[in-house]
Amino acid sequence: MGRPLLNRRLAAFGTTIFAEMSALAVRTGSINLGQGFPDSDGPEEVREAAVRALRDGRGNQYPPGPGIPELRTAVAEHQQRWYGLSYDPDREVLVTAGATEAIAASLLALLEPGDEVIALEPYYDSYAACIAMAGGTRVPVTLRPDTTGPHPAFRLDLDELRAAVTDRTRLILLNTPHNPTGTVLTREELAAVAELAAERDLLVVTDEVYEHLVFGTAHTPLASFPGMRERTVTIGSAGKTFSFTGWKVGWVTGSPALVSAVRSAKQFLTYVSSGPFQYAVAEALRLPDSYFHSLREDLLAKRELLAAGLAEAGFAVFRPSGTYFITTDIRPLGETDGFAFCRALPERCGVVAIPNAVFYDHQDQGAPFVRFAFCKRESVLEEAATRLKGLKVS
């Protein structure tokens, strides 16, 4: 055949780095701190709720297209409980097959070919693919490493964000807490985004799946700012908050017009999914505050454990304000190429990580940065830290 089989919009996207590195972990028997999935299940009562639904025959056949009423109501209650945001479960909440489908459906629904999408770089790799599938053009605004203060972090340059907007800009794709850097945008930064969106009549799709994984600060939804509820699609997920990533239950909240548009695209993707698990997630969202507090405290302890181990091994460490990922700089180890470093790491010390360069349009900007996940058991993190000590430059 003379014509390439793969659609030209996807030609630049091969096998994801997560598949490559996870396969490498299996082949070498390494500790996988690359892909962000926990190595233990979430709350027992939530798992049992799924079992009950299966046994009772609830959700074993096609659930309603927008999601079961119980889950849509629970999502609306969650947004009111934590953020004071009021959503109509029937018109302003849509259940999706995880957050990734929510992102894809939102972009497919809201973009015309040639529309520009501003995204904070580095970004979750599916953003670029979803923008491409929708025929959009991605415009990165790069979070820059700042090591001048006592707490190194990646920061947003608001002037750069404003300069990225053109007459072709349709929407901003926002992620806070941010994967992979762990940055949590401040109220001042979010207010500036809201002001810019209103001034230039932009939509915002905001990926907030790490909303409950924040340390020493509070998550603030963009939709809570004046005028933003009507122009913001907010995406949430059960996988990160409840440690059931395999269930693939996500959701969208927004105005009736926005949710209706996203549903129009979503219905031709999976249409429905995760029937019995939807009942379980509805119960999970109503867990007491103590669960969410314990989740943060547990992850904070794990963050400190792994961060200390990485620092001792010789990495420069960016302690995240949110998510369960730590970005490191490998240059103090005498390394500059994150790809080569991560591909060699399993053989060198039996640990798998992800090169941040895959999250950049211009990969040289992310070349020295490597991401580690700390959503693992403490014993696993301790063993990983021990193995990594062998890397330190003497």
Q: Model segments located where?
A:
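N-terminal small-domain helix-loop-helix segment of the aminotransferase-like
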Residues: 7-98, 105, 157-160, 284-287, ...
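Helix C-cap/helix->beta junction micro-motif
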Residues: 28, 134, 199-200, 313, ...
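PLP-dependent enzyme catalytic core of the Aspartate aminotransferase-like
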Residues: 162-163, 344-353, 358-394
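Conserved glycine-rich beta-strand-loop-beta hairpin in the small C-terminal domain of fold type I
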Residues: 282, 298-307, 317-330
